[in-house]
Amino acid sequence: MPAGSPENHVSAELLGILRDDLNVDVSRVTPDARLVDDVGLDSVAFAVGMVAIEERLGVTLTEEELLSCETVGDLQAAIAAEPRETRDE
């Protein structure tokens, strides 16, 4: 996959959100890592993550979309599948 591909951008930003916004040790995060059992996210972390994804990636996921993601890879795919918002702010 090319370095500048959208998938790599989403992956890098998601790892940044996990590290910076949710204080996750990303050295153990893989696409197969389960968000709750392996990464340790709880309901508060999901809410913070939802806001961070919107702010940093311009993608709005519904609560249902976010909660349907079991793994980091599922979350990456859900983000990549959503259209990015353009902001005039």
Curated annotation (Swiss-Prot):
The keyword Phosphoprotein is assigned to this record: yes
Pathway recorded for this protein: Siderophore biosynthesis; mycobactin biosynthesis
Quote a single Gene Ontology cellular component term. cytoplasm
InterPro entries, per this entry? ACP-like_sf, PP-bd_ACP
Pfam families this protein is in?
Answer: PP-binding
Question: PTM details?
Answer: 4'-phosphopantetheine is transferred from CoA to a specific serine of apo-ACP, leading to the activated holo-ACP form.
Q: Which residues carry this modification: O-(pantetheine 4'-phosphoryl)serine?
A: S43
Q: Where in the cell is it found?
A: Cytoplasm
- What's the domain of life for this entry? Bacteria
Record keywords? Cytoplasm, Phosphopantetheine, Phosphoprotein
Carrier domain location is 8-83
The answer to whether UniProt assigns keyword S-adenosyl-L-methionine to this entry is: no
What NCBIfam families does the record tag this protein with? PRK05883.1
What does this gene product do? Answer: Acyl carrier protein involved in the formation of acyl-S-ACP intermediates within the mycobactin biosynthesis process.
**What is the designated name of this protein?**
Acyl carrier protein MbtL
Lineage per the UniProt record: Bacteria, Bacillati, Actinomycetota, Actinomycetes, Mycobacteriales
Gene (name only) = mbtL
